[in-house]
Amino acid sequence: MSPLAAAKRLIVKIGSSLLVDDSTGQVRRGWLETLAADIAACKARGQEVIVVSSGAVAVGRRKLGLVPPLKLEEKQAAAATGQIRLAHAWQDALAHHQITVAQVLLTLDDSENRRRYLNARSTLETLLKLGAVPVINENDTVATAEIRVGDNDRLAARVAQMVSADALVLFSDIDGLYTADPRKDPDARFIPEVHELTPEIEAMAGDPGSAYGSGGMVTKLVAARICLSAGCRMAITRGEPMHPLKTIEDGGRCTWFLPNSEPRTARKQWIFGSMKPTGTLVLDAGAARALAQGRSLLPAGITEVSGAFERGDCVLVKDGSGKVLGRGLVAYSADDSRAIMGRKSGEIEAILGFRGRDELIHRDDLVMEG
């Protein structure tokens, strides 16, 4: 089975040079409809799909009569104009397959600020659970030069990391990684698989080569590094053919970046090895047994909360004797955790005034010792 077909959760990134006709500034609806059919086929076999789509600035600037190079405020105005047209194009294409589309606008801060990261992840998880296809773009309308991601390759990789995706496909104007830029060097050799981003691999990166696309091979290798560390497989391939996802499955040329671990394993390694605990939760015997059986940690099983931590921080989990059982990412702040400890999940809203997660630490965010 191909890495694409094996993915339970798939991210698809489309550059603006693929989605927007260079000569007219219009969305390439015929091509988009074939991609929508591919996405529908993925969903029909049980896969979850998230799209990261460029093109808002490219579409919007034509409508506003803006001529490149654009100032930051002109790009933002173009994005505001183009985003609504882009959303309609995606909605129309997927509606033919009875698929609900959700527009999500993100900035780099949403993926690096813990609170915003958790909110964005929760929203995306909920949309996927409800059967929708989230269509994500960088929020160019409010992003500044200092906080812009700068390319949707990197944004797509951050999203893949955020939702523990199994695979990310970067559609480009080139069919994969070569030892040199094949458009300039006839002796450039194609690289079908990469297992590690060595200095030699990084030296193979080329320059951007399309009128609209701002993501060259350099940004794609940055995305690959993020994906490999997150246990997510990533492909670089040409997006121009009709039915581009099906083309990959049918053996179309692409470069696969293959990690050594799965997303869930990589995420737990990150929690265990990279995050410093900022607090401690002490459990009763029943909660300790539940965790040993692979279940989530509920507020009812907490007997003591110590430390100062915020939602999304890492905390130690101990039993009543003080033995460390594990560590995990907590869904409530220290103050809120103290307020709901020992209480049933159904009481959370009445106590805190809002309804968050039922679990204090979800099992996917928990790493047990040993």
From Swiss-Prot:
Residue intervals of the PUA domain: 278-355
Compartments where found: Cytoplasm
Residues involved in substrate binding: S54, D140, N152
Pathway, per record: Amino-acid biosynthesis; L-proline biosynthesis; L-glutamate 5-semialdehyde from L-glutamate: step 1/2
Signal peptide coordinates: none
PROSITE patterns (UniProt xref): GLUTAMATE_5_KINASE (PS00902), PUA (PS50890)
Pfam family, one: PUA
Family: Belongs to the glutamate 5-kinase family.
Stated name of the protein: Glutamate 5-kinase
Upper lineage: Bacteria, Pseudomonadati, Pseudomonadota, Alphaproteobacteria, Rhodospirillales
